[in-house]
UniProtKB/Swiss-Prot annotation:
This is PR domain-containing protein 11. The keyword Acetylation does not apply. It comes from Homo sapiens (Human). The keyword Ribonucleoprotein does not apply. Gene3D superfamilies: SET domain. InterPro entries: PRDM11_PR/SET, SET_dom, SET_dom_sf, Zinc_finger. Keywords: Cytoplasm, Isopeptide bond, Methyltransferase, Nucleus, Phosphoprotein, S-adenosyl-L-methionine, Transcription, Transcription regulation, Transferase, Ubl conjugation. The lineage of its organism: Eukaryota, Metazoa, Chordata, Craniata, Vertebrata. PANTHER family: PR DOMAIN ZINC FINGER PROTEIN, PR DOMAIN-CONTAINING PROTEIN 11.
Length: 511
């Protein structure tokens, strides 16, 4: 406790957070602007000493030139830049340093006390390092030559290497390292001889020891397969990898290393933000590649299967022009071209085939004399009902074109999706579809077939009116008997009965 020069009537207890050497309780006057000379002197000395942290380790005397020549710090002094700490008083006689973050502060671990410390263990002192044999970087087989005293690198006939302890016991707690190699800033492992580390920015780096001219002997230490054979623990300190002896290693024993608990926690402590950033970066890259493929093949409307389709649970094999959302302009352009080709082909072929169509089809609307109008309409009605009955009896009411078109109503969507197939509503449409010379080369839907047929009918009727000739009424019974759909005996009997009674010519059909 500090002794005040004058007695103070009113005192206030305040915790001093700036001084670590003095007592944690200080006496201040109520008036903050009037402090004694002893307090001012104490604060002045404290400000000069705050933040100075001395790390005591066992070192070897080595010049900076040798550090540069051999590519490793001979002193093995920990990097002070990694110790970004905030002093704070804790209970007990010894003041400990509490870190701001586990990743910003590196601790050493005492195997005897099973406790972490920053500079030295209160019971066993600073950490003990086992130095490598100095070998310049770039020397062939440098990694094997850097083996410390008391150990050796053994190579078998297959070319595999291993490390073994010889001559003397390696005490528990001794530290080997750091692991040397090429540092890569990429957040992935570079190979079998690489170790991952986490930097201050919470990003992964790797130390690759595959190059024997730059690595050291630690690359030959084999990973432990069983817990009982493990005698080394790998841990990270100041963006470097060290091996710590977790028990005494006796002569003739092979060195086996495994990951320490704090090292595994450090690897798993990568922030969720970094993970999301990596995932977002990969997804953007994938979408960019997909868009480039679509631009390279603009005619392919199917395109690649997008991630959004799979996330929504849609089947990639069902084609429902959901791709139209991705290619709206291409879809509209293709549909316009289809209808344009159909219309042009229909108009061009209408004049050439008008006369043939007027003579061959019985479904064209024609103006006939009044006395034949009723008979013609009634016979057409009877013929329609006969066709429906025959189709229901034999199940042949649907005319099909290419194979694979379903007749079930539930598959209507699939029929509309295939532009090369359609379902005709009449034998005339079926004949149009079956004749390859009658159809344009462009594939189209059933409505296009009906449109073409209608255009031909109207054109044929217009040509007949312009010529001033009235079309002769067709002789229905012979034509009906020649139709393939009336090959059924029941249909023949109906028309033969009508002919025998003479009701067709007398206009009494259906009456």
């Amino acid at each position: 406790m500090l002794k005040m020069a004058e007695p103070i009537a009113s005192l206030m207890i305040v915790e001093c957070r700036a001084c670590l050497r003095c007592s944690p309780l200080f006496l201040y006057q109520r008036e903050k602007d009037r402090m004694t000379e002893n307090m001012k002197e104490c604060l002045a000395q404290t400000n000069a000493a705050v933040g100075d942290m001395v790390t005591v380790v066992k070192t070897e005397v080595c010049s900076p030139l040798r550090d540069q020549e051999y590519g490793q710090p001979c002193s093995r002094r920990p990097d002070s830049s990694a110790m970004e700490v905030e002093p704070k008083k804790l209970k007990g006689k010894r003041d400990l340093i509490v870190p701001k973050s586990f990743q910003q502060v590196d601790f050493w671990f005492c195997e005897s006390c099973q406790e972490y410390f920053v500079d030295e263990c209160p019971n066993h002192g600073p950490p003990v390092f086992v130095s490598d044999t100095p070998v310049p970087v770039g020397i062939p087989d440098r990694a094997a030559l850097t083996i410390p005293q008391g150990m050796e690198v053994v190579k078998d006939t297959s070319g595999e290497s291993d490390v073994r302890c010889v001559n003397e016991v390696i005490p528990k707690g001794h530290i080997f390292g750091p692991y040397e190699g090429q540092i890569s800033t990429q957040d992935k492992s570079a190979g079998f001889f690489s170790w991952l580390i986490v930097d201050k920015n919470n990003r992964y780096k790797s130390i690759d020891g595959s190059d024997e001219t730059k690595a050291n002997w630690m690359r030959y230490v084999v990973i432990s397969r069983e817990e009982r054979e493990q005698n080394l623990l790998a841990f990270q300190h100041s963006e470097r990898i060290y091996f710590r002896a977790c028990r005494d290693i006796r002569p003739g024993e092979w060195l086996r290393v495994w990951y320490s608990e704090d090292y595994m926690k450090r690897l798993h402590s990568m922030s969720q933000e970094t993970i999301h950033r990596n995932l977002a970066r990969g997804e953007k890259r994938l979408q960019r590649e997909k868009s480039e493929q679509v631009l390279d093949n603009p005619e392919d409307l199917r395109g690649p299967i997008h991630l959004s389709v799979l996330r929504q649970g849609k089947s990639p094999y069902k084609r429902g022009f959901d791709e139209g959302d991705v290619h709206p302009q291409a879809k509209k352009k293709k549909i316009d071209l289809i209808f344009k080709d159909v219309l042009e082909a229909s108009l061009e072929s209408a004049k050439v085939e008008a006369h043939q169509l007027a003579l061959s089809t019985s479904l064209v609307i024609r103006k006939v004399p009044k006395y034949q109008d009723d008979a013609y309409s009634q016979c057409a009605t009877t013929m329609t009902h006969g066709v429906q009955n025959i189709g229901q009896t034999q199940g042949e009411g649907d005319w099909k074109v290419p194979q694979g078109v379903s007749k079930e109503p539930g598959q209507l969507e699939d029929e509309e999706e295939e532009p090369s197939s359609f379902k005709a509503d009449s034998p005339a449409e079926a004949s149009l579809a079956s004749d390859p010379h009658e159809l344009p080369t462009t594939s189209f839907c059933p409505n296009c077939i009906r449109l073409k047929k209608k255009v031909r009918e109207l054109q044929a009727e217009l040509d007949m009116l312009k010529s001033g000739k009235l079309p002769e009424p067709p002789v229905l019974p012979p034509q009906v008997l020649e139709l393939p759909e009336f090959s059924d005996p029941a249909g023949k009997l109906v028309w033969m009965r009508l002919l025998s009674e003479g009701r067709v010519r007398s206009g009494l059909c259906g009456g």
